[in-house]
Amino acid sequence: MPQRAAPLPTTPPAPDWPVLLAIAGLAASSAAASLHAFTAIVARAASLARDGGPISPSSLLPALGLTDGLLAGLTAILLLAVVWLEWRRRAVSAMLWRANPTEMWVLLAVLLLWLGHSFCFPGVLLAADSGSHIARFLEMSRGFQAGFIPQWTNYQYLGSPLLAFTGPLTYILGGLLTLAVGDAVIAVKILATVVHFLTGLFYYAFLRTLGLSRSAALVASVGWTGSFAYLQMFLYRGLFPQLITVMLLPVLFLAAEHLMRRRRTGGGYWLLFALTTAALIVNHQPHAPFAAIYLALFGGISLLLGRWRWAGLVPMATAGLTGAAMAMIAILPVLEGAGWVMMEPDSGLALLRWPTTERLLRLVTWANTRSNWGSDYWAYLGIASVALAVFGAWTSLSGSATAHRRSIGLAVLPCVLLGLVLYNPVVRDIMFLGFFIGLLVALAIEGLLANRQAGHRIVLVALMLVLLDVASTAILPVARADKEFLAVAGRYLQSTAPNERGIEIGIQRDGSFQANTGPSAGVMSYFATPQRVSGHHNMAATLVHNYSGTSINLAERDLRWTGRLSTRTATLLAQLNVSRIVCTDPANMGCPETFQDASPEGPLGRRILVPDASPVLFSRSLIALSPPEGLDKPALWDPIFEFEPMAPRVAAIARFLHLYLDTAGIDPVRHTARALPVRQPPPGTTTDPADFEAVPVLEQYTVSLARVELVIAARQAGFVQLAHPWYPGNEVRINGTVTAPLQGAISLLVLPLDVGRNHIVIEPRTTPMTRLAAWISGTALAGALAVAGWLAWRNRRRPEHVASGDMA
């Protein structure tokens, strides 16, 4: 009968640095090998695709060279060294069993950095929403460079709010980082790598706060932050703001644990809970209520089981309310302006949705490429992690489990079940499901550690199963280094046509094409700021969105069926100040030969010039015209434009646009209209369609990130429609006097013109509601600091008592 292994010392005199250095070297060499080799392979594949050559293992092999061989050899040597150390003296398994604090932190750091090295592949990030966030990082940095926090961008959707209708925290951090490094793509990669690393550390710290062992916390942290379900949110879905949300979740629960289990309320943890609550709301408002629901369920069960103290409810509730008050700067302005943009009031409400078999299988079906679309975010969690989670649920409820472990399991299991059904289209629900699955994984390791018959290598076996499961999905070379032609085109447009707009059409390899109506941004907006009719965040687009998007779609349909723009479509685009339609395919700029009016222009290749584009449309009179109900909102998403025949709402908007043209009677050459259609003409306004004796002259027109400036000379009084959206959150000044603009029929600005020189400036304004929100947030922050200071002073000489479990 084999003898049980002799007990190992629980605390060695010093960390086993040779083993740690060997593991760190193995991680570094393997990461370098994958970065170098996959970068070369992707570049080779892109070159073959561009030239029409076959892509196969044999055709890709020549991409590898001497450096790849040396790195692979070094990796093999270090791997053998680690295996030898384990075989000769059980070095790795002993490390995991005794769980020396220094060894665990170093090992965790090495593994987290390795699991996040896919963020560091050279090239630009293209997947899904990546471009939208990179473009916003760039725009934020431009504002910071000019000395202000930008609230508005004129480069997207004819002009739209930049921060108010999305979580501003990530964009402020990303903008500052972009300003520091000078490159928005590099800033995103740095942010993703650092926050991914911190997420694993904070998750580990939270599990330790629960009283779970270091080995259990290590395996669970690696399993969650290395899972494809986690990484695909960022590498394949480009959901970079949710990096911060995922990072803050364990911090929120960690602070709650301390508040609810200590007899004395610590000022630091009270402040940490308040700040984390505020940060969750400010980063992405819809995720904060979901975090609160899960915390309430987890905490409610912990209270009923006696693991949490009822007396802790008051400090946690006050900290949470204080955090919500601090976040008013990201709440009240949204409530005020929701009717001015495409955001829907119920977009953040919690819903229940029963999971289908297909979605459940996706959690355990191996994948290393994008496997979900739209508002579905479930992806492969890892078969090893899920198996351990099932074992963890069973062992935590078995008769051999300690009371402490059982209480954690009973609090976690309902959260896992809730994670299967709680849903909202704008909430990335996989982060909550993965968070609690990781807790069950930790409980599984606790169960293995409690079984001394399993031997000292059982934790190593579990860790290796998890690592082997996540390793193949952690190496995801999604960055591309063959898109410089797009960056060149973007810089060209910024320098050549800074005050004009463009439309982008994507050409597929099979010759099909689709116009970009958003929400998205491409490499042309990564390093430059050309003006676009589409944009990067459609919920923040103004009420002109559906009309401009349908105008783009009409242009696409014209080009598909006739190869050229119709006169009416060209007129619609011209009054939006669209001067160019540019085309891109996977390898080049340039429109196809079927676009009959396209001609070459430098780095843009063949492009279409839209005749008579202008930011102004003049008239002597106004006429009432309002769209039927249901055309302004809700927002049209890009798939609806591809329906054949036209989707009913798109067709209704197209009919209204034609009615708008007929009513206005636009002369695109003179930039005049018989009458400007507005939704509510002022009382006494003339409807006489008299023409100008002399058409007003646009003497100056400049557009920057958050400011539009025009100078119009008029010999007769009249009106001007600007190719900028009506938005009450902006301020319009004419010759220094604040002027209330009229809302045009398609929600463009309409202003009066006086005889003489009209100097017009459009800039964001600070509304009374925003000032109130800032005052509440500032007061709450000051109050939170004062309360935390008082609590710290009060507790300085009083020892704290932990209710149960190891909080070290």
Language-model regions: role of each:
Residues 2-493, 497, 562-565, 578-583, ...:
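Membrane-embedded transmembrane-helix bundle of lipid-linked glycan/lipid transferases
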Residues 4, 526-578:
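Luminal/periplasmic acceptor-recognition loop/helix of membrane-associated glycosyltransferases
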Residues 82, 501-503, 572-577, 582-808:
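Flexible, solvent-exposed extracytoplasmic
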Residues 114-117, 141, 461-539, 640-645, ...:
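Extracytoplasmic
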Residues 169, 385, 506-508, 585, ...:
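Short, flexible loop/turn elements at secondary-structure junctions
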Residues 285, 332, 338, 508-511, ...:
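Short loop/turn segments at secondary-structure transitions that flank enzyme active sites
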Residues 295-297, 337-349, 480, 515-529, ...:
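Short secondary-structure boundary/capping segments
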